């Protein structure tokens, strides 16, 4: 998303809380819990600019910084905020669960900015009627991971939620171990999920579903308002955006790991970062979530899961649109995903033109990476240097016999391009990240933050915001992962 010059301060935010004007059982009004000794760890310049805020307004000793700290700790709300927890349902690992909703987070308010609306959602805000058996708290470990994930995905150009700030507190939270508490102020144009529509469909509340469709269109997709069938038009929009989103996940080696329908954004954003991972060694079957024993949400399953989730959403919309028309829209998913994936992978290979056989060239490159156990991200960086160096780095990264034959085909393909080698290298390095949110690096940041040192968090966040540009002295963040990095297990506990 574009970052623009800003001058607003925190107290100048204005809220228009449209969700609170929907039927009362769409939500429950809840006041955030107050946590002991809340301390700000970092404030995101990208998050500030999304809201139209001047990052300088949060400088040390600035009044807005203390106000933000109090907001993160549940000690205050901003004028115009109306905290609430949203109700929704969804399919979790393929099974419908009617008892879902915001269980640890609150929609604090919907800020109106020059670029549209932004939800301010406080994660770790305490228990709600939808907490089920949860304590409503968030831990520092998962909050750091979500904070960095938004920065990393935005830096890569992948649609995502963001965060304005990350804070910790003196609460001790029981998970697999006792962990420090935290709060995260998440930002998104909307938190509407596929599961919101599933809830209304399963409850046979067709009039309320029409209100929800109208709400999403009016708030976020006004160009669809004049459509003959607004629900069908909205579904087509969601299909296209979801296809592009998952294509980007596949191109950049990202595994969401918990693609339940309640974690799917109606706006095509990456939502709810849990046991996600950016792959190290290229492994199409990567499953970073140790609770996903059957690999339902493995890396190579994500495109198919996206289609399945969209089919559930389409079924939910059948009271408002012709089923055949919705099915026709659903058939647009795979071509849209393939087209976007091909575009992204051509760019990663330095190809501007479209030539028959490019898809096979890409697939054969990935086969080499899998055979070699090559690092997915470093291999692309090394390939970018191949045409301007002796290729030694590339041979180190992809040490397999078939590399030479593939490079001969690649060289032949490059003859159909107009760019010279140096220009192509620059273009490739502008889309192939040097700094990647690897699991072991996130763990190092977490351990430092738990020990009271937020400097690695701030440093890594700055690199992830622009992951393509090398910076002096930052070599450790770009180094190859150690062998033990592959044994780190992740869980859904947050």
Curated annotation (Swiss-Prot):
Keywords noted in UniProt: ATP-binding, Magnesium, Manganese, Metal-binding, Nucleotide-binding, Nucleotidyltransferase, Transferase
Signal peptide: none
Catalytic activity, EC: 2.7.7.-, 2.7.7.108
Residues annotated to bind Mg(2+): 263, 272
A Pfam family of this chain: SelO
Molecular function in Gene Ontology: AMPylase activity; ATP binding; magnesium ion binding
Binding residues for ATP: 101, 103-104, 123, 135-136, 186, 193, 272
Transmembrane spans: none
Catalytic reaction(s) noted: L-seryl-[protein] + ATP = 3-O-(5'-adenylyl)-L-seryl-[protein] + diphosphate; L-threonyl-[protein] + ATP = 3-O-(5'-adenylyl)-L-threonyl-[protein] + diphosphate; L-tyrosyl-[protein] + ATP = O-(5'-adenylyl)-L-tyrosyl-[protein] + diphosphate; L-histidyl-[protein] + UTP = N(tele)-(5'-uridylyl)-L-histidyl-[protein] + diphosphate
InterPro entries per the UniProt record, alphabetical: SelO
Enzyme class name: transferase
Cofactor: Mg(2+); Mn(2+)
Annotated catalytic residues: 262 (proton acceptor)
Function: Nucleotidyltransferase involved in the post-translational modification of proteins. It can catalyze the addition of adenosine monophosphate (AMP) or uridine monophosphate (UMP) to a protein, resulting in modifications known as AMPylation and UMPylation.
Family (UniProt): Belongs to the SELO family.
HAMAP family: YdiU_SelO
Protein name: Protein nucleotidyltransferase YdiU
């Amino acid at each position: 998303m574009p970052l623009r010059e800003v001058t607003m301060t925190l107290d100048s935010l204005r809220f228009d809380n449209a969700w609170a004007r929907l039927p009362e059982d769409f939500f429950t009004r809840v006041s955030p819990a107050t946590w002991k000794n809340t301390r700000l760890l970092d404030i995101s310049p990208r998050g500030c600019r999304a809201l139209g805020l001047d990052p300088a307004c949060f400088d040390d000793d600035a009044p807005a910084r203390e106000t933000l700290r109090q907001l993160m700790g549940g000690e205050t709300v901003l004028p115009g905020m109306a905290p609430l927890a949203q109700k929704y349902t969804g399919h979790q690992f393929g099974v419908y669960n009617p008892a879902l909703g915001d269980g640890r987070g609150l929609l604090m308010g919907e800020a109106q900015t020059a670029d549209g609306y932004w939800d301010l959602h406080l994660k770790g805000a305490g228990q709600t009627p939808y907490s089920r058996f949860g304590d409503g708290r968030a831990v520092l470990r998962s909050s750091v991971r979500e904070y960095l994930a938004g920065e990393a995905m935005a830096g890569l150009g992948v649609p995502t939620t963001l965060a304005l700030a990350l804070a910790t507190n003196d609460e001790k939270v029981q998970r697999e171990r006792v962990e420090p508490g935290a709060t995260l102020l998440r930002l998104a144009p909307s938190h509407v999920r596929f599961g919101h529509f599933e809830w209304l469909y399963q409850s046979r509340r067709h009039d309320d579903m029409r209100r929800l469709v109208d709400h999403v269109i009016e708030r976020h997709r006004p160009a669809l308002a004049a459509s003959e069938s607004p629900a069908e038009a909205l579904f087509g929009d969601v299909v296209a955006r979801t296809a592009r989103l998952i294509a980007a996940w596949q191109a950049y080696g990202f595994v969401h790991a918990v693609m339940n329908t309640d974690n799917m954004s109606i706006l095509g954003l990456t939502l709810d970062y849990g046991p996600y991972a950016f792959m190290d060694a290229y492994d199409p079957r990567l499953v970073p979530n140790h609770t996903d024993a059957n690999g339902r949400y493995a890396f190579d399953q994500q495109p198919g899961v996206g289609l399945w989730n969209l089919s559930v959403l389409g079924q939910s919309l059948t009271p408002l649109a012709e089923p055949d028309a919705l099915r026709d829209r659903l058939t647009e998913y795979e071509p849209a995903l393939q087209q976007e994936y091909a575009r992204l992978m051509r760019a990663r290979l330095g190809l501007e033109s479209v030539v028959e056989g490019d898809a096979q060239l890409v697939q054969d490159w990935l086969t080499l990476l899998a055979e070699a156990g090559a690092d997915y991200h470093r291999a692309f960086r090394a390939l970018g240097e191949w045409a301007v160096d002796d290729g030694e780095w590339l041979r180190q990264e992809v040490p397999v016999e078939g590399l030479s034959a593939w490079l001969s085909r690649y060289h032949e393909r490059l003859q159909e391009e107009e760019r010279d080698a140096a220009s192509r290298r620059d273009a490739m390095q502008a889309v192939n990240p040097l700094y990647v949110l690897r699991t072991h690096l996130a763990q190092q940041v977490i351990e430092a933050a738990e020990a009271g040192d937020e400097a690695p968090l701030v440093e890594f966040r700055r690199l992830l915001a622009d992951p393509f540009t090398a910076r002096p002295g930052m070599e450790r963040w770009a180094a190859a992962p150690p062998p033990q990095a592959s044994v780190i297990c992740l869980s859904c506990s947050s």
